Amino acid sequence: MPNNQECATLLNQWIRFFRNGHIGVNYIGKTKKGEKVTEQNKQPIEKDLNPLNSTKPLFEKINENTVYLRIPDFEISEKKAIDSLILANRATILSTENFIIDVRNNPGGSDASYSSLIPFLYTQPIRTVGALFYSTDLNNQRMLELSQNPDFDEESKKTFKNYYEKLQANKGEYVDLFNKKVNITKMDTIQPYPKNIGIVINENNGSTTEQFLLTAMQSKKVKLYGRTTKGMLDISNVNIVTSPCGDIELYYGLSKSYRIPDFPVDDIGLQPDVFIDKTIDPLNWLNFVRDHLNGK
């Protein structure tokens, strides 16, 4: 093998023969130009409206009847920015008929990062199907690291520590951390506004973003617009391990969903309610969604 970068490329080709989601390797060593290369950032990015170029969440009022929220990433490091933006514009969202949430190209992150959106979507109890975690010392290290991550609040960190201890007590087994296959979330209030919520999706959505969509799809207010998502959720909760040479990292899923085999998402994806076909220029996607929500 000429070098570690080519080794990583060949390993990914071999891995992709078996499955696409939540397993692979990234080359993280130096290239000739001194840049780091990963499989993720080599993937093509759809050219679209300027909001898609934003690396941070942004909010706009498009017109009297419609507000727009762009969320490019659900990484836990983005939670504070997402929550702050939503809080600053909460009154506007709650007084506007239509709400567009644009998650195109959002690859996932942490479920906690979309929690502040749920009160706007909620219309009835939300069912979230759980998962089993495979317990080993290496796998469990991720849960311990989450319990020490400053981006999570103290309650979450305490919960992660409890999960870690439960996993350590059951090594070599698949562990149900939540002691139930389905969690049901009930809220006291159904907000009258926004009345209609359009979530814009595409083929680059996976992982936590697809979990957000499974939650949102249970709302009577929500329609999904765009293209079928990537399909990368059944095997999830990624752990990352660096090779001894330090040039390659392996990422792989730690959990398997109770949804499978009855409702698989991996390599299938989630379909939109309203398909945006290729005759509609990517520059006009948001105009299309806006007009559809406004009944035009």
Residue ranges: model-predicted function:
Residues 1-155, 193-196, 223, 228, ...:
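Flexible, low-complexity junctional segments that flank or bridge functional domains
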Residues 127, 132-134, 158-176, 255-271:
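Extended, charge-rich low-complexity interaction segments
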Residues 146-149, 158-229, 234-236:
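Flexible, glycine-rich surface segments
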Residues 251-253:
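Conserved active-site loop/cleft motifs that coordinate metal ions or position small ligands
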